[in-house]
Regions:
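Non-catalytic, surface beta->alpha helical segment in thiol-disulfide oxidoreductase systems
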Residues: 72, 78-105
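A short beta-strand-turn-helix
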Residues: 2-19
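Short acidic active-site motifs
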Residues: 9-10, 60-64
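Thiol-based oxidoreductase modules, predominantly thioredoxin-like and allied folds used
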Residues: 4-5, 24, 39, 43, ...
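Short pre-active-site segment immediately N-terminal to redox-active cysteine/selenocysteine motifs
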Residues: 18, 25-28, 72
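A short glycine-leucine-enriched loop at secondary-structure breakpoints
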Residues: 66-71
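Conserved redox-active cysteine motifs that mediate thiol-disulfide chemistry
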Residues: 24-38
Length: 105
């Protein structure tokens, strides 16, 4: 399950964790809603390898989304100790998201 993400979590958590995965989304975004259950499932599957978060770019994740240069949602970014490693933009099937995670974490 994805933990809710707020801007202050970046300094408190993301910079200190070995691997963090953030799904940047918006409440009005259909592809974001479709990706959420996939990410929830993968968060459980990969819980020993990374921490998973859900950031609404219009509610609580505004500054982090802006700093990360989010131009479209959904965007999933993988961080290692607060440094971006890779990102995937747009809704993708579970198999593609798994490949993305395997490659980067």
């Amino acid at each position: 399950m994805l933990a809710d993400f707020k801007d202050e979590d970046f300094d408190n958590k993301i910079r200190n964790e070995d691997v963090s995965v953030i799904q940047f989304s918006a409440a009005w975004c259909g592809p974001c809603k479709a990706l959420k259950p996939i990410m929830d499932k993968l968060a459980v599957e990969y819980k020993d390898k990374a921490s998973f978060y859900y950031a609404d770019i219009e509610d609580g994740g505004i500054n982090t989304g802006s700093a990360a240069g989010i131009r479209g949602v959904p965007t999933v970014i993988i961080y290692k100790k607060g440094v971006e490693v890779d990102r995937k933009v747009g809704g993708v099937p579970e198999s593609h998201m798994k490949e993305f995670l395997e490659k980067n974490i």
